[in-house]
Each structure stands twice: as structure tokens, then as C-alpha cells.
């Protein structure tokens, strides 16, 4: 039977290093205020009728990592604060700007009129793979 240390060593690239997950206090993150003022990726996310609080929290966490502009929460999609959402958002619901809007279709139309290029993310007939997508860095996007 392998020890925990031996198991960890087997799953690292170098046998002399044990990888350890950093604590939030060790990440040297900027403050919420600094995050709000920081440059953002010209991308917004529109979530429509998402039931899973964990999925919503995960989108917040990803949005925080990529410093996206905003998340639009539409329809029955829950809004912060919520303890179940916080479990996966890990505080990103405080850093990422978000807005609740009832109607996703109107929101997408408004974003389009503001110059956003809109893409839908779905596994569907006729869709393209993400690695085949080419983005123009001079444009703003909504997904």
C-alpha cells in the first residue's frame, strides 16, 4: 500500500516536488476594489434559466479568472448571494460584475446593438469546435 506522499509523488512531473494547493491567502490576489478597476477581457456571459447553483458559481469563478466584464443572469437563474453558489464561486460573486435581467433574448439583442459579437455555446448540429473558433481581439464578445 502506497503512502499519501508516494501517491502524490507519482502524480507530479518531478519526483522531488509535492504539489500543494495554495490557500486563498497565499494567492496574492488583488483586492475587490482593485479587481473592479482592473482592465477586463471584452467578454460578457449570458446565463439563461440555469438551475444548478454550482454551475452558476463555477461560471463566476471562471469569469473571475479571466477578468470578464460582466455576467447577465436571466430568467430563473439564481443571483448572489446564495450559500450553494458560494461553494463553487469561492468569492468570485463579489469581484465579477453581474446583472439580473428577466429576458435573455432582449439582453442579447441589446448587447448586439452595443457592438458585441454574439456566440451561443451548445452541442448542436452545425456547431463548430471551440478550437476552430478564431476571435478578433479588436471586438467585444457575448456568449
Cite the ranges covered by each PLM segment.
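Post-transcriptional modification and biogenesis factors for structured RNAs
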Residues: 1-143
